[in-house]
Amino acid sequence: MEKLFALQERKEALRIVLEVRKVLTRVSSVMRSNYYVAREEIKNDGGNVYLFDAYFCEVYDCFNDDVNLFNEFTYNYEGTTEDIKEMFIDLYGEDVDALPDCLRNAINWDDVISDFIRFDCIAVNYNYDTYYFRNV
């Protein structure tokens, strides 16, 4: 059973990696560079890089592949926690269970979600505790 679980985890990780590659081909070189730097810092701090990758893709998908809007949001966003919460509710509805796993497990509405929208990149909270980057 453990081997099966490990295999499923590897398949999911590969799926996420392929999705990230697809996204990265469509974003600016600056964002690509920032993504790699942020991912390396998470890895060095023992964070969950696959959750970071999945969150990166989910946020990108939220903007319906609109690269300009995505870049504007990730580079210039200065909204409040409530603004970000409303954005996800608009997309996924009030039911938290409707959120993708990586968002449902990563977001605590009571904390400042905008901490994720930093680094002129996205989705990295430099606190790296297990609350934000726990396994899904």
Name each model feature, range by range:
Residues M1-V136:
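Acidic interaction surfaces
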